[in-house]
Amino acid sequence: MDKLLIQGGHRLSGEIAISGAKNAALPILCAGLLTADALQLSNVPHLQDVATMLKLLRQMGLQIEQDGDQVTLNGSGVDKLEAPYEMVKTMRASILVLGPLLTRFGEARVSLPGGCAIGTRPVDQHIKGLQAMGAEITIEAGYIHAKAKRLKGARIVTDMITVTGTENLLMAAVLADGETILENAAREPEVTDLANLLVAMGAQIAGIGTDRLVIQGVERLHGASHAVIADRIETATFLCAVAAVGGDVTLRKARTDTLDVAFDKLREAGAILTAGDDWIRVQMSSRPKAVSFRTTEYPGFPTDMQAQFMAMNCIAEGSSQVVETIFENRFMHVQEMNRLGAAITIEGHTAIVNGVDKLVGAPVMATDLRASASLVIAALAAEGETLIDRIYHLDRGYDRMEVKLSAVGAHIQRVK
């Protein structure tokens, strides 16, 4: 099993190219199920989750051609309307095939999801929404079995804001009969990216980027070309790394309009940020100042950036409070950071981080995707050598992170 070996204490300088967003690419790939025509996608990131999704779609009969970051999908031969447990257990985003399969083919059988070990994340909102559109749904032997002759438009109010729920119901609604209104819809940029692709395919969607999406169902969708948006979480991860370690790094192919809350917190920590249309420069010459924050839905502070900012706070001047409101089990990185010498205590949904003068390298273990990224940041800032085990979590959501960091001066290598 691969590990990362990191020698800490080296400032970062140079340029890093940001990859396409994992959380946009996964639903967008599933949109290939909605049409018999070709979908041409670019800026698709090289990630384990993307490879898993492509494998699942191939199993269903989707024709797929890959060339670098370009992926062409053709859904004319889809004949297997099932996502089996073996695929879904490694990646909960597999649930995103449910809406497209049901709305285009009238049937779907999808295993209940797995993915990271950070809480339950139930799929009941997906099921309730599809039932409101007329689907007959049974859950037996760990599978969701959904049937519908043609879905009917409906007004759906989700009990909670759910990103994958919004995406699934949006894809189901575009081919439904009549008008669907999604209230309390997720506003994440990745949802907007999916909606923009669907419109390019011929869907009729109003309210894109708001919490109220109005969809007029159409008979069929056609092919389209689309570039996946830049990954704001990867972008924030590298910004945090420079803020924690010090240096001067420019991020290319980045999106600046989706990172307001991260920019505010990094400036509060003492980083100097400048940005253009598709680049961000971060300069850090002093020890960061501690910043407190509370995770919440977009446009608030993303739960997917919580661990990385906590890593920066570990060696910051002062103490900070980090409140996690999205997932109930998302402080698993804390005990690993404390092994490096951090001073973090947990009280319920709050982590209290007392900044220390230095972290010292040690063997640590990644527990989930963003936790693994936070351990990389902590290791880069630590004195001496850190060995991070179980980095398959990192590969699920980061495109060759160690290669990108090496290019800006980090002493980091993948070892067996």
Swiss-Prot record:
Q: What class of enzyme is it?
A: transferase
EC number(s) for this protein?
Answer: 2.5.1.7
Q: Which residues bind UDP-N-acetyl-alpha-D-glucosamine?
A: R92, R121, P122, V123, D124, Q125, D304, I326
Localization (cell): Cytoplasm
**2-(S-cysteinyl)pyruvic acid O-phosphothioketal found at:** C116
Q: A biological process (GO) annotation for this entry?
A: cell division
Cellular component GO terms, alphabetical: cytoplasm
Q: Name one GO molecular function term.
A: UDP-N-acetylglucosamine 1-carboxyvinyltransferase activity
Question: What reaction(s) does this enzyme catalyze?
Answer: phosphoenolpyruvate + UDP-N-acetyl-alpha-D-glucosamine = UDP-N-acetyl-3-O-(1-carboxyvinyl)-alpha-D-glucosamine + phosphate
| Residue positions binding phosphoenolpyruvate | K22, N23
Metabolic or biological pathway: Cell wall biogenesis; peptidoglycan biosynthesis
The catalytic residues are C116
| Pfam name, any one | EPSP_synthase
SUPFAM superfamilies referenced in this protein's UniProt entry, alphabetically: EPT/RTPC-like
Q: What does this protein do?
A: Cell wall formation. Adds enolpyruvyl to UDP-N-acetylglucosamine.
Q: Which family does it belong to?
A: Belongs to the EPSP synthase family. MurA subfamily.
UniProt protein name = UDP-N-acetylglucosamine 1-carboxyvinyltransferase
